[in-house]
């Protein structure tokens, strides 16, 4: 895959140098319509705040079916680990408390996305629980000439795992779930399993992708499965790929199994449990992709003929949200760590535990920026932490940065071609927005 070098040009936009002449960006600047809001800081709603109001929108037509399987981006592959008890990431970068230039930020993001062929993109920036800036670019539905707005919802793919992990950690705090006990027993399953080792897999191992549970895409996109619950149950009948706790392999199946546990313990449907426990207390709204159709207000996306793959991913990658919704969740986790009295979703000890990295496999080339994984969080190696997500025509990222900023960028389209590039785009956009 060709690598991109991102630099800010004299006009404050992104210039792209490709390592291979075989890759290029398509599209024109005509798509870069921008809707933004960064005039005054807005305090994040707490538990008593009303939910975000979505404006009425026209139901977009069905998308042209894709002829390819949806692809999910996995941070890494299987590798033997030596320890999962290292300390959480710490930083010494001073917090940024100066002005934030939303227009400069937008210029960088738009140049890297919709100006090069993406359908739409949205961003949100927060600091210490306050909204600094939100913006949207491009078209929510180009076939209907519907522009994207700050209320447009995007498929957030594996960023969904952060929501699932947060709810699980709440239940660990409450004593309803034991982090280091087998999940099967807590789910009321006593076997027999196709692989007896399944009965020993702990909740922590599911959260950290060290369970050995299969990562096969066939679990989700084969066998005529229609729901994530079916995918999870199907996985229980598979042989583990390694002894639990001895290796790391990123697997969506882990989080579908956690979804089953969440439903069992709370007595609520998974979507309801996430809304009540994670989203509503911080004034965020989102929905789990429920049908083959795109809802009004959702960004247009590619589809796979005859398959509702978002529904099958569920707790692992099925949420649809605005950039601000995603930023609010990450910001609440950060507040729980740095200002426990202001935390609204989990205790500081839980966030600290979520940020303890498991060793990342040695790859060629090595993982970008020394990335590693915790409990439902990606640790980016520079002190930033959050999560990324990539699936058919969708790129998503939310990052809690060492400078105190929380940034989310959600993209519908194929540019950049991976979330590694979005990390660089965020760095450049923040640099432009905070330049003296």
Regions found by a protein language model. Name each.
Residues 134, 141, 194-390, 397:
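Short, surface-exposed loop or secondary-structure junction motifs
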Residues 1-148, 170-177, 208, 264, ...:
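N-terminal leader/targeting segments and the immediately adjacent pre-domain N-terminus
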Residues 125-127, 187, 291:
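A general secondary-structure junction signal
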Residues 101, 105, 156, 160, ...:
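Hydrophobic (often cysteine-bearing) scaffold residues that line and stabilize catalytic clefts
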Residues 138, 149, 184, 355, ...:
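Residue-level detector of conserved, well-ordered beta-strand and adjacent loop positions
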Residues 2, 16, 21-27, 93-135, ...:
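Catalytic loop of the DD-peptidase/beta-lactamase superfamily, centered on the K-T-G motif
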Residues 116-122, 143-205, 242-251, 314:
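Short active-site loop at a secondary-structure junction
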Residues 109, 123, 129, 161-164, ...:
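Residue-level preference for non-acidic, small/hydrophobic
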